[in-house]
């Protein structure tokens, strides 16, 4: 076990350029996960191939010598198919046909099949093959048939460590990975009066429109708040009137419920009234003023009338 651990450590400590496919095949999932955790990765992949790819991408980030990213993609476990041999076929055309099609010097008149400004040896390269025309009217066709493995581009997983975060992307082709590595290696120079100036100019009228809309919204909201205040005051007045009416009704109901108390108070008032009249007459006689008997009889009549009204209300 110790020998295996030491070999794994020695393999992982090698620089990325010195790693071979044999070294990568000797690595295990646990070795890769342990290495990634030691480097600060929180959740390494449980898949062996993905963990190895994460180790290779991490080593490429820590080793600034290889900025192109080709070392990472070269170590992907997906083996690329070998380039198939090119099949070359030689087609011989008769000279008579070439002469009939205008294989003549440029100084002569234009013919039916004459080509202007065409060099004697023309070369055309395309995706399917390569065509060459020589002096001796020979055409060499170089055909490179594509295998089904080539049509499906090699796709792998890409891990990016940036600002303390780990981002893992699946299905990244090699060309895209190279472009990302080039983009990360080159610094970005932003012009002073470039894109940001235009964005500022665009943002200014937007802010003015917002400043114009805000006062209108405030003016629309002000009368609504005033109307709500007026309605609130009216509701308060109505509720106050209801409260006062209920209070009056409670007072009248209390007086009707206790007739004995009212009658006793009336009796006490009637008993006290003759004494008050006598004292009042003595005061008047002492001062020298006298009242007519009509005035003396009016005061008890007034009190009796009040008592009679109270008795009628109680009944």
Curated annotation (Swiss-Prot):
PROSITE patterns: TIFY (PS51320). It is found in: Nucleus. Residues 293-315 have a biased composition (Polar residues). Residues 113-145, 248-315 are annotated as: Disordered. Disulfide bonds: none annotated. Interacts with AFPH2/NINJA. Belongs to the TIFY/JAZ family. This is Protein TIFY 4B. It comes from Arabidopsis thaliana. The lineage of its organism: Eukaryota, Viridiplantae, Streptophyta, Embryophyta, Tracheophyta. The gene is TIFY4B.
């Amino acid at each position: 076990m110790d020998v295996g651990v030491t070999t794994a450590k020695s393999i992982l400590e090698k620089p990325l350029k010195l790693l071979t496919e044999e070294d990568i095949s000797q690595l295990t999932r646990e070795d890769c996960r342990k290495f990634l955790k030691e480097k600060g990765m929180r959740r390494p992949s449980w898949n062996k191939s993905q963990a190895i790819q994460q180790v290779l991408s991490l080593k490429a980030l820590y080793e600034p010598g290889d900025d192109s990213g080709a070392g990472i993609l070269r170590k992907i476990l997906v083996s690329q198919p070998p380039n198939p041999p090119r099949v070359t076929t030689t087609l011989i055309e008769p000279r008579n046909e070439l002469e009939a099609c205008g294989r003549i010097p440029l100084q002569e008149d234009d013919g039916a099949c004459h080509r202007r400004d065409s060099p004697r040896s023309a070369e055309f390269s395309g995706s399917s093959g390569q065509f060459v025309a020589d002096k001796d009217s020979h055409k060499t066709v170089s055909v490179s048939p594509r295998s089904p493995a080539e049509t499906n581009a090699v796709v792998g997983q890409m891990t990016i460590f940036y600002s303390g975060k780990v981002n893992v992307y699946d299905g990244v082709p090699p060309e895209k990975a190279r472009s990302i590595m080039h983009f990360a290696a080159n610094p970005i120079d932003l012009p002073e009066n470039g894109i940001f100036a235009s964005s500022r100019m665009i943002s200014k009228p937007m802010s003015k429109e917002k400043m114009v809309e805000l006062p209108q919204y405030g003016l629309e909201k002000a009368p609504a708040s005033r109307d709500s205040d007026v309605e609130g005051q009216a509701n308060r007045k109505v509720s106050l009137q209801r409260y006062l009416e209920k209070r009056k009704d409670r007072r009248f109901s209390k007086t009707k419920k206790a007739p004995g108390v009212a009658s006793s108070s009336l009796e006490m008032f009637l008993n006290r009234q003759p004494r008050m009249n006598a004292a009042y007459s003595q005061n008047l006689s002492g001062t020298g003023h006298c009242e007519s008997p009509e005035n003396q009889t009016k005061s008890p009549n007034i009190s009796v009338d009040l008592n009679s009204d109270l008795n009628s209300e109680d009944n």
